[in-house]
Swiss-Prot record:
<keyword id="KW-0560">Oxidoreductase</keyword>
<comment type="similarity">
    <text>Belongs to the azoreductase type 1 family.</text>
</comment>
<feature type="binding site">
    <location>
        <begin position="16"/>
        <end position="18"/>
    </location>
    <ligand>
        <name>FMN</name>
    </ligand>
</feature>
<comment type="subunit">
    <text>Homodimer.</text>
</comment>
<dbReference type="GO" id="GO:0010181">
    <property type="term" value="F:FMN binding"/>
</dbReference>
<feature type="binding site">
    <location>
        <begin position="96"/>
        <end position="99"/>
    </location>
    <ligand>
        <name>FMN</name>
    </ligand>
</feature>
<comment type="function">
    <text>Quinone reductase that provides resistance to thiol-specific stress caused by electrophilic quinones.</text>
</comment>
<dbReference type="InterPro" id="IPR029039">
    <property type="entry name" value="Flavoprotein-like_sf"/>
</dbReference>
<dbReference type="GO" id="GO:0009055">
    <property type="term" value="F:electron transfer activity"/>
</dbReference>
<keyword id="KW-0288">FMN</keyword>
<keyword id="KW-0285">Flavoprotein</keyword>
<dbReference type="InterPro" id="IPR050104">
    <property type="entry name" value="FMN-dep_NADH:Q_OxRdtase_AzoR1"/>
</dbReference>
<feature type="binding site">
    <location>
        <position position="10"/>
    </location>
    <ligand>
        <name>FMN</name>
    </ligand>
</feature>
<dbReference type="GO" id="GO:0016655">
    <property type="term" value="F:oxidoreductase activity, acting on NAD(P)H, quinone or similar compound as acceptor"/>
</dbReference>
<dbReference type="InterPro" id="IPR003680">
    <property type="entry name" value="Flavodoxin_fold"/>
</dbReference>
<comment type="function">
    <text>Also exhibits azoreductase activity. Catalyzes the reductive cleavage of the azo bond in aromatic azo compounds to the corresponding amines.</text>
</comment>
<dbReference type="GO" id="GO:0016652">
    <property type="term" value="F:oxidoreductase activity, acting on NAD(P)H as acceptor"/>
</dbReference>
Length: 204
């Protein structure tokens, strides 16, 4: 039984391209494996607090020494981390906002990328602790950034691949829905291409 963590980060709830394609992917997976468990983490419907000094203080204080306030702060991060460790497959909807990820997704990363929890430092360098999992990232962007002259401006997929790899999530497939700001034809073309990719990834 596969456990899937589905993370959506678009602030657009009703007409989001990234939400549309992650839903299509999840539905396709469920059609193949009806008993798969899907855990939803919606970073727009349930936004996470951005980390501050109090958050860092809680993270770096041993659990047995935390104040009640620090314990409460750390509980949220520990819940998010547990969702990652429990998942076999991680699906991330990651629209590009100003060449990078959404602030909500950055907040999630800051809560889960923690030294001694999801990665550790060794004498040979940092080692990610979230291993043996498959990640699918569904990006959406108004222009085309996976190739061509704008490729150097992609700090969305490239950043996610880097930071996820740092915590051990190295088996990453990125599916881009690009050119969605180029009118209805651009949207339809992007969605059709993504649907074809999903069918290739999850053949019937």
């Amino acid at each position: 039984m596969t456990k899937i963590l589905n993370i959506n980060s678009s602030v657009r709830i009703g007409d989001s391209i990234s939400r549309k394609v992650t839903t299509e992917f999840i539905n396709k997976w469920k059609a193949r494996e009806a008993d798969a468990i899907v855990v939803e983490r919606d970073l727009a419907a349930q936004p996470l607090p951005h980390i501050d000094g109090s958050t860092l203080g809680a993270f770096f204080t041993p659990a047995e020494q935390r104040t009640p306030e620090q314990a409460q702060i750390a509980t949220l991060s520990e819940t998010l981390v547990r969702e990652l460790f429990d998942a076999d497959v991680i699906v991330i909807g990651a629209p590009m906002y100003n060449f990078s990820i959404t602030s909500g997704l950055k907040a999630w990363i800051d809560h889960v990328a923690r030294a001694g929890v999801t990665f550790k430092y060794t004498d040979k360098g940092p080692v990610g602790l979230l291993t043996g999992k498959k990640v699918y990232i569904f990006t959406a962007s108004g222009g085309v950034y996976s190739e061509g002259p704008a490729q150097a401006m992609d700090f969305n997929a490239t950043y996610l691949r880097t930071v996820l790899g740092f915590i051990g999530l190295t088996d990453v497939t990125i599916i881009n829905s690009e050119g969605v700001a180029m009118g209805a034809e651009g949207v339809n073309k992007a969605l059709a291409k993504t649907s074809n990719t999903i069918n290739e990834l999850l053949p019937a």
